[in-house]
Amino acid sequence: MFTGSIVAIVTPMDEKGNVCRASLKKLIDYHVASGTSAIVSVGTTGESATLNHDEHADVVMMTLELANGRIPVIAGTGANATAEAISLTQRFNDSGIVGCLTVTPYYNRPSQEGLYQHFKAIAEHTDLPQILYNVPSRTGCDLLPETVGRLAKVKNIIGIKEATGNLTRVNQIKELVSDDFVLLSGDDVSALDFMQLGGHGVISVTANVAARDMAQMCKLAAEGHFAEARVINQRLMPLHNKLFVEPNPIPVKWACKELGLVATDTLRLPMTPITDSGRETVRAALKHAGLL
């Protein structure tokens, strides 16, 4: 469940900015049918930053309910205060989710020792498997391989989503962790190369709109068929890139609407609707991928 193509799913909203249950069900059904390995609910792409804690928990639980055992659900539970991250994580104890994706604290930029103590404290307050999430381009904080190696010794810290796009990190981390420590790319552009170096899969934005292709690419990679996987990846490469032509999740939410997967591309401020030029750029990438 922690390998292959795991989607960082969008949180669909109605025109008033409320979570749209019908669109969420449609998305989940799409991922079940497409072979997606698991869903990350309310991560960065799921607009965690603009949901309050009650809404955050409600969306995760709604996702779990609508999935109904058909696909594993991972909860995004990161926060920049350790006590807050613990509180959010504990909401999902005994809920049925299979694990938590926990981003490094953002804005306050802790030291490596602070990061170690932060993640260790969270893990000690739950039995849920914990996946570390390193995305310094968003957080201003880089979880270094040496710290990952220390954290990998904590019993329920089972993997990392490594979103630096720096492929040297794969081997650096592999040298410091056990073979069963899960290495997931958080960068669609370099995900296939990441897997060829020994990674186990990707937590993907592209999978929101190209779920079957991403699942097949990851399956081929896991089987060692990298030439075939690369054919799929090259077709998706413009999409990997152009889904970030404006801040995530603006482009991917619009793409979901364009493909009829959600009813609206509504976002909450300070996120704003996609621009006309962004729309045309993403539409061209969708066509290149064979999705339009």
From Swiss-Prot:
Q: Which SUPFAM superfamilies match?
A: Aldolase
Q: Which family does it belong to?
A: Belongs to the DapA family.
Tell whether Lyase is among the UniProt keywords.
yes
Any one Gene Ontology cellular component term annotated for this protein: cytosol
Read off the InterPro entries from this record.
Aldolase_TIM, DapA, DapA-like, Schiff_base-form_aldolases_AS, Schiff_base-form_aldolases_CS
Chief location: cytoplasm
Q: Which reaction does it catalyse?
A: L-aspartate 4-semialdehyde + pyruvate = (2S,4S)-4-hydroxy-2,3,4,5-tetrahydrodipicolinate + H2O + H(+)
As for subcellular location, the record says: Cytoplasm
NCBIfam families given for it?
A: dapA
The entry lists its GO molecular-function terms as: 4-hydroxy-tetrahydrodipicolinate synthase activity
Binding site residues for pyruvate: T45, I203
- The protein depicted here goes by the name 4-hydroxy-tetrahydrodipicolinate synthase
Tell me which PROSITE patterns the record gives: DHDPS_1, DHDPS_2
Q: What does this protein do?
A: Catalyzes the condensation of (S)-aspartate-beta-semialdehyde [(S)-ASA] and pyruvate to 4-hydroxy-tetrahydrodipicolinate (HTPA).
EC number(s) for this protein?
Answer: 4.3.3.7
Sorted alphabetically, the Gene Ontology BP terms of this entry are: diaminopimelate biosynthetic process; lysine biosynthetic process via diaminopimelate
- The protein's site described by Part of a proton relay during catalysis is found at T44, Y107
- Quaternary structure? Homotetramer; dimer of dimers.
Q: Which residues form the active site?
A: Y133, K161
Give the keywords, sorted: Amino-acid biosynthesis, Cytoplasm, Diaminopimelate biosynthesis, Lyase, Lysine biosynthesis, Schiff base
**Known pathway:** Amino-acid biosynthesis; L-lysine biosynthesis via DAP pathway; (S)-tetrahydrodipicolinate from L-aspartate: step 3/4
